[in-house]
C-alpha cells in the first residue's frame, strides 16, 4: 500500500483542522428550521467568559456532541446552539483583578461605562478563545446561531420576562435578610452560599436587667452583633427565666433598652437557655423579630465594617470589633467566659468571604406559585432526570424552595428594568427600548435601578432566548423548542436546571427540555508528601507527572482523588491533552468515564490507553484497506453470496447487530461509558482479535476459494463502513478521515443498492461525509440455528488449546498439532477447525475416532468434544499434574450440582428450564471427568 495514500501512523494534528474545516465549510452544522425532519435540539450550557475551557467543559460538550452526531445520523434535524455566559459576579471579579494587576486601578476608579467597556473587551477575547477550543474538541454546533447571555436578543427576553413576572406580582422589592458578600459587596442567593464546619468560640455575656440588680447571661458565637440587639429571648417553659419575661435589659455600649421575650423557638438546653436577638444579622433572629415586631438595626456597612449604629466601634472591621468588644466587656465585668465551639459558617462560592446576614432592600421572585408545577413536571415524567436517584434531590429542593433574591449590586449584568421616582415611591417597569414615556418627558425626576439581575435569571431563560423568544413567530422557537435534553453537572441542578424549569414554564407554560442528564464531577489525582514532622504539601511538576504515569509512590507520598484545583496541582488542561493525544482520544476518554455517579476519577493513563485504541483503529483499518483496495463500490452494490458465509462471518454480523441494539438502549438512558466500552470492545476484540485473525488465511490465499476470498473482502468493507458509523459520534475526526479514504478507494456509488448485507454500507457511501451518513442499521442474513452456541463451542475449544499451551509452557510461537474426537458433532467440528487453527495457533487439527496410542498428548473436553494437543515426551509429568487439577475441579462441580439436584425443594420450586440446565451441566461434567480419568489411566 502506498505510504502517501495511507500512512503507517495516524497523526491527529495533520488531519483534525482540515476535517473540521471541511465539515464547517460544507454547512453540515447548520440546522434548517423549515425542515420536515423530526427536530432534536440542545442548547449548550454556556461557558463563563472568565477565561478558557476546563475539563468539565470538555466533558459536557463531548457528551452533547456525541448525542448530536448520533441523532444527526439517525435522520433528525439537529440544532445545537452554542453560546457563552456573561457570569456577572465571576467575570466582574476577574476583570477587577486584571485591571488591578495591569493598571493598578480599582473598579471605582472608573465610571460605570468605562469599566463596562473593559469588561466587554475581556468578554470578546475570552469568548474567542472558548469558541476556538470548542472547535478543537470537534463540537458540531450551529455557529450561525451562536448566542451570548447579554446579546441584544437575550436582553430583550430578560426585560420581557421581568415585566411579565412584575405585572403578575411575582417579582417584588422589599427589605429582607440576604446573604451579603462583603468582598464583592453584593447579595447572593441561598444556593450560592457554601457551608463549612469551622472551629470557633461560644462567648458568654451578661446583660443587666433594668431597675434591678439581676443580670441575664446569654451565649453567642458573634458578640460583635450585640450592637444590633433588639431583644433577649427565653423559652416560656423555662422556669429559670419566667419571672423576667416582659422585663428589659440594657445593651452594653449603646445603652439601648430591649425587652426579654418568651419564644418557643428557643432551645433551653443551648448555652444558658437565653439568647440575644439581632434581627438584622441572623436568619433565625429575623423570623423571631418579625413574629414579635421587633426593630431591625443594621450595624454593618456593605464592606463589613461597623456603621454609625455601632457607637465607639464605628469603622472597625467585624473581626477587630469582636476583639475590642470582648476586651471592653471584660473591663465592665460583663464578660463571663468563652468555650470552644464548632459551627456551620456560610462562605461565598465566588470570593470565599464569610457571608454576612444583612438587612437590605432587594428584588425577589416569589416562588410559592411555581412549587406545584415544578414538582409535577418531574413526577409526571414530562421531564425525566437521569440518573433517577437525583429526582429525590430535585423534589427535596423544590419542597424547601425560598423566595429567590434576584438583584445584585454589580455593574456587569442585565440592569433591572425598573425606574424609580426621586420624589415618591412610584416605580415603572418597562421592557421596551430606551425608557418609559414618563422618564423621557421628565428625566430629572427618575433614575433607573442601579442593580443588575442575578446571572441565573438570564440563564434561566437560555432555552427560550436561544430560539428567538419573545418572538412567538420565530421559526426556530416553533421547530426546536422545547429542547430534547439538557446535559450538565449535578452540582448545578439547583442553581440552573430548576430555575430554567421555573422561568421557561412561567413564560410559555411548557417544560424547557424533555430529559436532564446530570454527569458526575471530575476529580483528579493529587499527591501529598509528608515530612518528618508530619506536615505535608502537594507534589507538582515532573514528579507529579511521573506518578500519574504509574511510577511507584514513596512511603511518604499519599495519592488522593480530589476536585480539580490549581492549588492541589491536579488540574488537567483539555487543550494540552488534545495537543498530546488528539481530540478523539480525549473524547473517548471522557465518554468512557462519564458514569452515572457523582464523581469521575480522571486518570492520566486513560488518555494513553485510548490514544492506543485510536492507533489500533487506524492500523486495523489500514490492514483492511490492504485487502479491499481492488474492490469498487459496484462490487458492494452487487451484494454477497450468503451461501459462502462461514460460521465466523455469521458470528461477526450477529455481534454487530447485538452491538447496535445495546448501544441504542444506552443512548436512550445516557450511559455514555457503556456506549464507549461496547464500541471499543467490538472493534478491538470481536473484529480485530477474533474475526480478522480467523479470516487471515483466506485473505492471504492459504485456504478457501477465490469466491470465498471475494466474499470476505466485501464483508470486511461493509463492516468497516458500518463500524466507522457507530464510532463516529464519539471519535469523529479519525472516522471521518477513514470514511473519506473509503470513498476514494471504492469510488462513486452508481445506482445499485446492494443487498441485505451490503445495502446500508452502499447507502452510507453515497453521503458526502460520515457525519451526515445514515447511522448503521442491523444487517439481515439467514443466521443459522444455534449460531451463538456453535461459535461459543469454537471459542471454548480455542480456549482449551490456549490453556494447554500455557500450562504446558509451550512456546507461543510453536505451531501445534491437535486432534478432535467427537462421534456426535462431526459437522460442527468441521466448521470449528479453521477457527481453532487461526486463533489457537494450531498447524493441523485431525478428527479421530479415538486418541492416538503412540503419542503423548494433553486432553480437554468441551460439550462432549475431546480436544487433544500432541506434546513432546518431556511434558508427560506436567500433563499429569494438569489433569489432576482438572479432575479435582470437575469432582467439586459434580458434587455441588448433584447435591442441588438431590434437593426436592430445588426440583419442585425452581424453574423447569433451570433444573434441566443443571442436569445437562451434570451430564457434561461427568462425561468430561470420565475422559480425564481415562487419560490419567493411559498415562
Curated annotation (Swiss-Prot):
Residues 874-939 form a coiled coil. Gene3D superfamilies: HUPs, Isoleucyl-tRNA Synthetase, Domain 1, Valyl-tRNA synthetase, C-terminal domain, Valyl/Leucyl/Isoleucyl-tRNA synthetase, editing domain. ATP binds at residue 566. InterPro entries: aa-tRNA-synth_I_CS, aa-tRNA-synth_Ia, Anticodon_Ia_Val, M/V/L/I-tRNA-synth_anticd-bd, Rossmann-like_a/b/a_fold, tRNA-bd_arm, tRNAsynth_Ia_anticodon-bd, Val-tRNA_synth_C_sf. Keywords: Aminoacyl-tRNA synthetase, ATP-binding, Coiled coil, Cytoplasm, Ligase, Nucleotide-binding, Protein biosynthesis. A motif ('KMSKS' region) lies at residues 563-567. GO terms for cellular component: cytosol. A motif ('HIGH' region) lies at residues 47-57. Its main location: cytoplasm. Transmembrane segments: none annotated. One of its GO terms (biological process) is valyl-tRNA aminoacylation. ValRS has two distinct active sites: one for aminoacylation and one for editing. The misactivated threonine is translocated from the active site to the editing site. Belongs to the class-I aminoacyl-tRNA synthetase family. ValS type 1 subfamily. Catalyzes the attachment of valine to tRNA(Val). As ValRS can inadvertently accommodate and process structurally similar amino acids such as threonine, to avoid such errors, it has a 'posttransfer' editing activity that hydrolyzes mischarged Thr-tRNA(Val) in a tRNA-dependent manner. This is Valine--tRNA ligase.
Amino acid at each position: 500500500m502506498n505510504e502517501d495514500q495511507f500512512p503507517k501512523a495516524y497523526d491527529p494534528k495533520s488531519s483534525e483542522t482540515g476535517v473540521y474545516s471541511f465539515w464547517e465549510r460544507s454547512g453540515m452544522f447548520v440546522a434548517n428550521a423549515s425542515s420536515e425532519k423530526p427536530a432534536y435540539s440542545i442548547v449548550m450550557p454556556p461557558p463563563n467568559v472568565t477565561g478558557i475551557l476546563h475539563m468539565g467543559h470538555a466533558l459536557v460538550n463531548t457528551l452533547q456532541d456525541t448525542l448530536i452526531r448520533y441523532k444527526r445520523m439517525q435522520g433528525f434535524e439537529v440544532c445545537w446552539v452554542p453560546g457563552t455566559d456573561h457570569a456577572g459576579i465571576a467575570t466582574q471579579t476577574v476583570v477587577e483583578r486584571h485591571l488591578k494587576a495591569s493598571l493598578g486601578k480599582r473598579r471605582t476608579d472608573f465610571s460605570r461605562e468605562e469599566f463596562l467597556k473593559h469588561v466587554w473587551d475581556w468578554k470578546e477575547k475570552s469568548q474567542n478563545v472558548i469558541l476556538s477550543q470548542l472547535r478543537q474538541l470537534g463540537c458540531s454546533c450551529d455557529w450561525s446561531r451562536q448566542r451570548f447571555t447579554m446579546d441584544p436578543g437575550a436582553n430583550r427576553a430578560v426585560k420581557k420576562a421581568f415585566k411579565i413576572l412584575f405585572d403578575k406580582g411575582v417579582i417584588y422589592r422589599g427589605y429582607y435578610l440576604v446573604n451579603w458578600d462583603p468582598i464583592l459587596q453584593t447579595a447572593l442567593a441561598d444556593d450560592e452560599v457554601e457551608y463549612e464546619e469551622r472551629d470557633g468560640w461560644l462567648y458568654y455575656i451578661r446583660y443587666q436587667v433594668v431597675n434591678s440588680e439581676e443580670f441575664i447571661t446569654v451565649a453567642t458565637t458573634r458578640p460583635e452583633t450585640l450592637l444590633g440587639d433588639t431583644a433577649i429571648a427565653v423559652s416560656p417553659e423555662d422556669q429559670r427565666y419566667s419571672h423576667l419575661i416582659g422585663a428589659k435589659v440594657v445593651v452594653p455600649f449603646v445603652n439601648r433598652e430591649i425587652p426579654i421575650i418568651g419564644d418557643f423557638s428557643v432551645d433551653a438546653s443551648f448555652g444558658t437557655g437565653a439568647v440575644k436577638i439581632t434581627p438584622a444579622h441572623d436568619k433565625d433572629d429575623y423570623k423571631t423579630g418579625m413574629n414579635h415586631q421587633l426593630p431591625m438595626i443594621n450595624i454593618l456597612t456593605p464592606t463589613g465594617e461597623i456603621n454609625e449604629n455601632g457607637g465607639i466601634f464605628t469603622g472597625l472591621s467585624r473581626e477587630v470589633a469582636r476583639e475590642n468588644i470582648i476586651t471592653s466587656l471584660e473591663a465592665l465585668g460583663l464578660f463571663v467566659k468563652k468555650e470552644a465551639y464548632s459551627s456551620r459558617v456560610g462562605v461565598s462560592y465566588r470570593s470565599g468571604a464569610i457571608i454576612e446576614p444583612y438587612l437590605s432592600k432587594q428584588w425577589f421572585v416569589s416562588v410559592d406559585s411555581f412549587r406545584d408545577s415544578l414538582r409535577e413536571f418531574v413526577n409526571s415524567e414530562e421531564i425525566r432526570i437521569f440518573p433517577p436517584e437525583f429526582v429525590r434531590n430535585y423534589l427535596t429542593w423544590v419542597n424547601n424552595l425560598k423566595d429567590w433574591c434576584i438583584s445584585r449590586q454589580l455593574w456587569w449584568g442585565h440592569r433591572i428594568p425598573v425606574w424609580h421616582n426621586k420624589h415618591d415611591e412610584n416605580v415603572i417597569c418597562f421592557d421596551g427600548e430606551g425608557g418609559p414615556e414618563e422618564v423621557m418627558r421628565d428625566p430629572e425626576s427618575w433614575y433607573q435601578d442601579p442593580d443588575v439581575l442575578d446571572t441565573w435569571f438570564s440563564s434561566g431563560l437560555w432555552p427560550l432566548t436561544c430560539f428567538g423568544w419573545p418572538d412567538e413567530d420565530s421559526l426556530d422557537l416553533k421547530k426546536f423548542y422545547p429542547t430534547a435534553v439538557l446535559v450538565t453537572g449535578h452540582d448545578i441542578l439547583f442553581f440552573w436546571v430548576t430555575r430554567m424549569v421555573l422561568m421557561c414554564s412561567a413564560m410559555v407554560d411548557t417544560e424547557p427540555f424533555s430529559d436532564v442528564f446530570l454527569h458526575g464531577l471530575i476529580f483528579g489525582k493529587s499527591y501529598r508528601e509528608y515530612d518528618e514532622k508530619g506536615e505535608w504539601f502537594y507534589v507538582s511538576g515532573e514528579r507529579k507527572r511521573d506518578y500519574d504515569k504509574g511510577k511507584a509512590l514513596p512511603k511518604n507520598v499519599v495519592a488522593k482523588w480530589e476536585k480539580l484545583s490549581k492549588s492541589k496541582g491536579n488540574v488537567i488542561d483539555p487543550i494540552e491533552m488534545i495537543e498530546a493525544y488528539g481530540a478523539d482520544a480525549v473524547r473517548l476518554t471522557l465518554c468512557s468515564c462519564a458514569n452515572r455517579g457523582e464523581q469521575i476519577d480522571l486518570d492520566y493513563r486513560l488518555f494513553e490507553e485510548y490514544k492506543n485504541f485510536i492507533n489500533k483503529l487506524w492500523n486495523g483499518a489500514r490492514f483492511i484497506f490492504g485487502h479491499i483496495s481492488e474492490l469498487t463500490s459496484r462490487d458492494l452494490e452487487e451484494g454477497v453470496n450468503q451461501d459462502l458465509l462461514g460460521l465466523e462471518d455469521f458470528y461477526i454480523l450477529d455481534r454487530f447487530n447485538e452491538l447496535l441494539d445495546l448501544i441504542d438502549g444506552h443512548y436512550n438512558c445516557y450511559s455514555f461509558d457503556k456506549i464507549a466500552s461496547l464500541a471499543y470492545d467490538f472493534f478491538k476484540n470481536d473484529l480485530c482479535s477474533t474475526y480478522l485473525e480467523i479470516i487471515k488465511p483466506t485473505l492471504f490465499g492459504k485456504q478457501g476459494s477465490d469466491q470465498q476470498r471475494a466474499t470476505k473482502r466485501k464483508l470486511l468493507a461493509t463492516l468497516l463502513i458500518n463500524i466507522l458509523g457507530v464510532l463516529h459520534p464519539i471519535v469523529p475526526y479519525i472516522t471521518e478521515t477513514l470514511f473519506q479514504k473509503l470513498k476514494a478507494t471504492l469510488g462513486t456509488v452508481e445506482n445499485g443498492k446492494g443487498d441485505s448485507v451490503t445495502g446500508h454500507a452502499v447507502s452510507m457511501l453515497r453521503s458526502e461525509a460520515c457525519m451526515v451518513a445514515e447511522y448503521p442499521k442491523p444487517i439481515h442474513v439467514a443466521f443459522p440455528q444455534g449460531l451463538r452456541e456453535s461459535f461459543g463451542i469454537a471459542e471454548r475449544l480455542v480456549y482449551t488449546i490456549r490453556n494447554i499451551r500455557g500450562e504446558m509452557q509451550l512456546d507461543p510461537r510453536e505451531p501445534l498439532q491437535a486432534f478432535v474426537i467427537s462421534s456426535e458433532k462431526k459437522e460442527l467440528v468441521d466448521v470449528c477447525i479453521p477457527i481453532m487453527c487461526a486463533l489457537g495457533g494450531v498447524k493441523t487439527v485431525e478428527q479421530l475416532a479415538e486418541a492416538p496410542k503412540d503419542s503423548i498428548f494433553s486432553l480437554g473436553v468441551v460439550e462432549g468434544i475431546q480436544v487433544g494437543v500432541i506434546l513432546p515426551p518431556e511434558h508427560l509429568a506436567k500433563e499429569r499434574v494438569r489433569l489432576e487439577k482438572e479432575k479435582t475441579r470437575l469432582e467439586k462441580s459434580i458434587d455441588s450440582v448433584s447435591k442441588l439436584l438431590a434437593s426436592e425443594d430445588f426440583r419442585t420450586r425452581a424453574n423447569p428450564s433451570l433444573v434441566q440446565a443443571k442436569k445437562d451441566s451434570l451430564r457434561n461434567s461427568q462425561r468430561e471427568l470420565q475422559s480425564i480419568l481415562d487419560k490419567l489411566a493411559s498415562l
